[in-house]
């Protein structure tokens, strides 16, 4: 039965308007984005199939077009609707850390870095460049691949910092395994970067490791001082 045939007020869009989005299940929220069903499935059934196939809402939104379109009822148009929702969220997050924004909210930084790095299938080492008042200058992805003490070059970090005239930095990288716990190599990299940056009087404020559902902060663990 299509959602249009449901009793008045019971469809996901009606429930969202009446009760708020927080009262909807993941499948119902996804159904609102999909708008309608296909191949004999209503939008909620299609959304449930997507979640069951990929294992969760986040995994659905991170899936590629070819992966999504393999499922019955899904095509390029519905994939585009999902990607647009992801992009809107990403752009709002990026606006919150736009150039000149004073970085005073740790949760804002965590949210931004999580959105930037969590769903990468490979490791990315990035740097958030700040001025002397901790206003954002730029977010830059520096290295990709296997991040270890041999693949992160302090001289490249120093060169970028000098070029952008940064006074402080936050470095970060992701663990595609989903486990955010820092490795011994992560700690060695941090020490090398801290020493290199100190030679040009630039502060390393934090090193954040992004996992599947959490971020580990070196500063919070007392590993930066």
UniProtKB/Swiss-Prot annotation:
Organism: Shewanella woodyi (strain ATCC 51908 / MS32)
Record's keyword terms, sorted: Hydrolase, Metal-binding, Metalloprotease, Protease, Zinc
MPN domain ranges (all copies): 102-224
Family under the similarity heading: Belongs to the UPF0758 family.
This protein's record includes keyword Zinc: yes
Protein name: UPF0758 protein Swoo_4561
One Pfam family from the record: UPF0758_N
Amino-acid positions noted as binding Zn(2+) in the UniProt annotation, renumbered to this chain: 173, 175, 186
Annotated GO biological process: proteolysis
Motif (JAMM motif): 173-186
Keyword Protease: yes
GO terms of molecular function: metal ion binding; metallopeptidase activity
């Amino acid at each position: 039965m299509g959602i249009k045939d449901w009793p008045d007020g019971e469809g996901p869009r009606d429930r969202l308007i009446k009760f708020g989005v927080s009262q909807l299940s993941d499948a119902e929220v996804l159904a609102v984005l999909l708008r309608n069903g296909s191949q004999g499935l209503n939008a909620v059934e299609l959304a449930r199939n997507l979640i069951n196939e990929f294992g969760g809402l986040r995994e659905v939104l991170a899936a590629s077009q070819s992966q999504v379109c393999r499922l019955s009822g899904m095509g390029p148009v519905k994939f585009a609707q999902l990607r647009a929702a992801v992009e809107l969220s990403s752009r709002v997050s990026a606006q919150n850390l736009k150039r000149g924004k004073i970085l005073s909210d740790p949760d804002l930084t965590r949210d931004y870095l999580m959105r930037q790095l969590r769903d990468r299938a490979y490791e990315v080492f990035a740097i958030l460049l700040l001025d002397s008042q901790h206003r954002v200058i730029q977010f830059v992805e520096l290295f990709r691949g296997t991040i270890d003490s041999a693949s992160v070059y302090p001289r490249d970090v120093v060169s970028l910092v000098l070029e952008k005239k940064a006074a402080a930095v936050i470095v970060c990288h992701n663990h595609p395994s989903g486990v955010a716990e820092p490795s011994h190599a992560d700690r060695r990299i941090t020490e090398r970067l801290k020493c290199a940056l100190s030679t040009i009087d630039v502060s390393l404020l934090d090193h954040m490791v992004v996992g599947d559902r959490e971020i580990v902060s070196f500063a919070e663990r007392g590993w930066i001082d």
